[in-house]
Amino acid sequence: MRAAILTQYSHDFELGQVDDPVITGANDVIVRVGAAGFCRTDIHLWLGQFEEVHRQAGIGLPFVCGHESAGWIAEIGPGVTHLKVGDAVLLHPLATCGYCPACRAGDDMHCSAQIFPGVAAPGGFAEYVKTNARAVVPIPEGMTPVEAAPLTDAGLTAYRAVKKALARAVPGTYTVVLGAGGLGHIGIQALRALSQTEIIVVDRNEAALERALSWGADQVVLARHDRSHVAEVRELTHGAGANVVLDFVGEGGAEVDAVELLGSNGMDVIVGYGGRLEADILTQVLTPEASFVGSTVGTYTELVELVALARRGAVKLSTQIFPLEGINDAMRTLEQGRMIGRGVLVPTQD
């Protein structure tokens, strides 16, 4: 089958042929990929930052990335009875076992036997991808794979972060969202759908801030290199600071901004990564009793919830579409900060 292949770290992806996936387990599902989201994690993979993950998984280069997939079922294992060939589906990023303590507790994203297509197994930047039946969510009627694919990781990650914030993001509070890009634009909408907190969005892109207002933000602030935006945000909170910060950036200074924006007993939900905090930052969080909460991709159940929000029109994805052969254009567009919403590759069409 045709695929976009990572053959060398920090070099362009190459279009070529790789083996088709095959059914090896009773619950396996093979999907013809109609859309695959392009994620910043794919850039980290491209840079070689997941080389140790690959080594532990017993794989290496060449490798097929892509962990946000949607399309149509092409083949199912003999144990799959609730799905059929031709069904339009989106895929939770992880193929999980269902039996380990994490799965039984409903925390399937922490499955001890997980398979992660696109990160630790061949992914969706190809005509076909293999997962298992536990990862499959039907696409609602009227929704396309292009619309569905970014929900599977970008959407699900943003949604889980929002759910973690809800206990504190009650009416009369301030929630600051750092970043209105691929994850942030989904998080803003999910937060607006589920909460009446005052939403303040910070981003370096003026166009993204304009769109943030249409997504449900109450106030927007342009991030500046002199960091004057921190004082501006605190002024919008009448000096109290944020009850919650949702940091969808996690680098480039945003990780420091998040700490300085927190009010007393504030919570920093950390989603983006790549930055560093100095040890003396602890003195800024001790007295106000600030808390830090890590947040990763959500559960299967949360993906079903998010799809329901999208079906009702409460969450609408902004996407920029590329053919599979345009993968290097997609990578550079994201890397250079020019991506509008979420980049989506289209390996095959209906």
What are these regions (language model features)?
Residues R32, E206, V256-V259, Y300-D350:
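C-terminal hydrophobic helical "lid"/dimerization subdomain
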Residues G37, G77, L94, V249-G250, ...:
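Short glycine-/small-residue-rich Rossmann-like dinucleotide-binding loops
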